[in-house]
Amino acid sequence: MTKIYNLAILPGDGIGPELLQKDLNFKVLKEQYKLKINTTEYDIGGIAIDKYGKALPKETLDGCKESDSILFGSVGGPKWQHLPPDQQPERAALLPIRKYFNLFSNLRPAKLYSTLNHLSPLRRDISEKGFDILCVRELTGGIYFGKPKGYIKNIIDKKAFDTEIYYASEIKRIAHIGFKLAQNRKYKITSVDKANVLESSVLWRETVNTISKEYPDVKLSHLYIDHAAMQIIKNPDKFDVILTSNLFGDILSDECAMITGSIGMLPSASLNDSNFGLYEPAGGSAPDIAGKNIANPIAQILSIAMLVRYTMKLPMISDHIESAVIDTLKKGYRTLDIANDKEKYVSTNDIGDIISDILKKRI
């Protein structure tokens, strides 16, 4: 019997709705690849605050529970920045979903395409070497979720505090993910910590070293976070899989994204043990360009490719989607964010249609 995939679609705010409108609409996957896909749309983020008074309504969470995975757009914008931090869309919508579904593994690929080499802020002699980095970030532990935390204002010298806590079991499970991914790439993994200062990083390094013995074919190296940040700028081509904690991964994955030249090209997947995932573009809601039909949908489309690879377990189809994106770029099609002064750019809708047409021809 053909598997039926039920997907929760969460467009959110800003450019999210228009990008998910051009997400191939799953039409190609349904018609050309004969996949059985049901999609249901739910409100999240600022638009949900306006309608329901909260960023993550019960109806949305219940819908996600009934789904095989989530395709997410973006949340947030100036309209809701006056709210207390724990009620703002970015924090009140995403963090509870990550915690509820135990989405402990965040995968953020950062690839510099040869056709877009000129966009990288790196020196030309560095960018010309290219790079293809996969950041594997532990997503549900560490300082973002550690207790106690607080902000004490009713004293002369105000103070605030957060707690970085990791259990060995949390480190083990993300380490296994990282090593297995490295086995499907270049058999090389770099673990990033601050073991010269932080006790949590001492445990991190000890645990990763222990897990590495189960993967003798993968070469493991360690870097401190400050040195890793420097080396990503200096020698990005030397990296393959980067394995790191929640806080450090938050920083390094954005650094890797920006040296590609456009965050609008980069997808993201957050997964649990059962292949349930939240798939989203790495960029934000970009309210300044929302509704103008100029946003880059490629990150959203590549997020679908990740969904097909990791939840549906159909790597060949995922490869086809990624190849269609590469061919589109080789043919010279660009959205505004990746076009230079001499190139004519196409709209959000147009580039989505072009990628779909190329994908159809691959079958």
Swiss-Prot record:
Q: What does this protein do?
A: Catalyzes the oxidation of 3-carboxy-2-hydroxy-4-methylpentanoate (3-isopropylmalate) to 3-carboxy-4-methyl-2-oxopentanoate. The product decarboxylates to 4-methyl-2 oxopentanoate.
Spell out the coiled coil positions from the record: none
**E.C. number:** 1.1.1.85
Q: How is the cofactor bound?
A: Binds 1 Mg(2+) or Mn(2+) ion per subunit.
Instruction: Kindly state which reaction or reactions the protein catalyses.
Output: (2R,3S)-3-isopropylmalate + NAD(+) = 4-methyl-2-oxopentanoate + CO2 + NADH
The residues that the entry says bind NAD(+) are 77-90, 284-296
Q: Which EC class is this protein assigned?
A: oxidoreductase
Pathway given in the UniProt record: Amino-acid biosynthesis; L-leucine biosynthesis; L-leucine from 3-methyl-2-oxobutanoate: step 3/4
The record's annotation in PROSITE patterns points to: IDH_IMDH
Q: Which UniProt keywords apply?
A: Amino-acid biosynthesis, Branched-chain amino acid biosynthesis, Cytoplasm, Leucine biosynthesis, Magnesium, Manganese, Metal-binding, NAD, Oxidoreductase
The main location class comes to cytoplasm
What protein does this entry describe? 3-isopropylmalate dehydrogenase
- Binding positions for substrate? R98, R108, R137, D226
What cofactor requirement does the entry state?
Answer: Mg(2+); Mn(2+)
| One GO biological process term | L-leucine biosynthetic process
Q: In the UniProt record, what gene is named as encoding this protein?
A: leuB
Q: Where in the cell is it found?
A: Cytoplasm
